[in-house]
């Protein structure tokens, strides 16, 4: 797949994001295209709409487990919308959810250093991996069970988590910290 992003200035504008994503899909018109839509609150309806129209989407800028859950729900609901509109074969709809890793530790580490206790400092570099592990458990839950099985029977693909921003920003950490921990 190749990903092309909607204009980032539209991240807080549902209607224009949807219009831009649709226009990119129609302009490029390639089966291996994923249009990037930011995982903002305003992006969630666009994700659902595009998936419901049978278009492949790369959801970007996911920084929290709660938002990741909302992104997966938008994807699954979009697949259900596709079925409700008469699409019987869902196998051509693909999506990834780009969950950003290192930026979480960058922010949390800064706050832990402000606290400055030994206990706080011992937690540096651990939040992002822990959050990704929790997110993965939600992935397992979302893409199993009767609701998912009904979609999978029509060829639906899981929305794969994409661990993004896996290079460390802190020079004290191994360059492969996140890759090593998440494999």
Spans of features found by a protein language model:
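Active-site beta->alpha loop and helix N-cap motifs at the rims of alpha/beta catalytic domains
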Residues: 1-46
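General beta-strand structural signal in soluble alpha/beta enzymes
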Residues: 4, 35-37, 50, 59, ...
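Acidic (Asp/Glu)-rich catalytic clusters
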Residues: 22-29, 51-52, 87-91
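Catalytic alpha/beta core domains of metabolic enzymes, predominantly
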Residues: 47, 55-182
């Amino acid at each position: 797949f190749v990903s092309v992003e909607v204009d980032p200035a539209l991240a807080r504008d549902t209607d224009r994001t949807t219009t831009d994503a649709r226009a990119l899909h129609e302009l490029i018109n390639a089966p291996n295209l994923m249009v990037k839509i930011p995982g903002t609150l305003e992006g969630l309806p666009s994700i659902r709409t595009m998936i419901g129209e049978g278009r492949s989407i790369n959801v970007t800028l996911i920084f929290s487990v709660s938002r990741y859950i909302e992104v997966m729900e938008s994807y699954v609901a979009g697949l259900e919308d596709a079925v409700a509109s008469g699409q019987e074969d869902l196998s051509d709809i693909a999506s990834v959810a780009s969950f950003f890793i290192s930026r979480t530790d960058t922010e949390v580490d800064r706050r832990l250093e402000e606290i400055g206790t030994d206990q706080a400092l011992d937690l540096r570099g651990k939040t992002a991996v822990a959050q990704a592990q929790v997110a993965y458990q939600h992935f397992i839950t979302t893409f199993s069970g009767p609701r998912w099985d009904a979609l999978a029977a029509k060829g639906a693909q899981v929305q794969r988590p994409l661990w993004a921003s896996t290079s460390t920003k802190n020079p004290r950490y191994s360059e492969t910290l996140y890759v090593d921990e998440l494999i």
